[in-house]
Regions:
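Proteins enriched for Cys/Gly/acidic motifs involved in redox and nucleic-acid/cofactor modification
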Residues: 1-151
């Protein structure tokens, strides 16, 4: 797996420490750090509730990421930190572009969360492909039946 991860850190010294913890964790599942968010497969915003307008900065940044990835594959978007912990469900409802929300107490689970998300995404793609193929087969059968019916 040649995946790249970018983490933008807002706020306090603790968040800088947590960002390094996250980088150390995701290395174990094949992610490499990048300084260029546009080449990332995984984009994490590590947030801080103490700083002014932290929540709005998150939504502003997500807007920037959406714009950058409009014509290429969307990265896995994760909101981490204390804003994520406090606003978990609200963030997911307000911004569907967010894939995962993880608070500081769950950083030890971040690899499992990422791998579970990727597995579910793979299954969903496979189901969509199967539905498309089944629909395509049914359309071909219908066309063949209509041709047969005209004789």
């Amino acid at each position: 797996m040649n995946q790249k991860i970018f983490i933008k850190t807002f706020g306090c010294q603790m968040n800088e420490y947590d960002t390094n913890r996250i980088y150390d964790a995701v290395k174990k599942i094949g992610y490499k750090k990048t300084e260029n968010y546009e080449e990332a497969n995984c984009y994490i915003l590590n947030t801080c509730h103490i700083r002014d307008k932290a929540k709005e900065k998150v939504y502003h940044d997500i807007g920037r990421v959406k714009k950058s990835f409009r014509f290429k594959q969307k990265p896995l978007v994760i909101i981490a930190g204390c804003v994520a912990q406090a606003e978990n469900q609200e963030m997911l409802k307000r911004e569907p572009y967010i894939d995962l929300v993880v608070g500081p107490q769950a950083y030890h689970k971040i690899n499992d969360m990422i791998l579970d998300y990727q597995e579910k995404k793979k299954k969903k793609k496979k189901q969509s492909l199967m539905q498309f193929l089944n629909l395509n087969i049914l359309v071909k059968l219908k066309i063949n039946l209509e041709r047969f019916h005209h004789f």
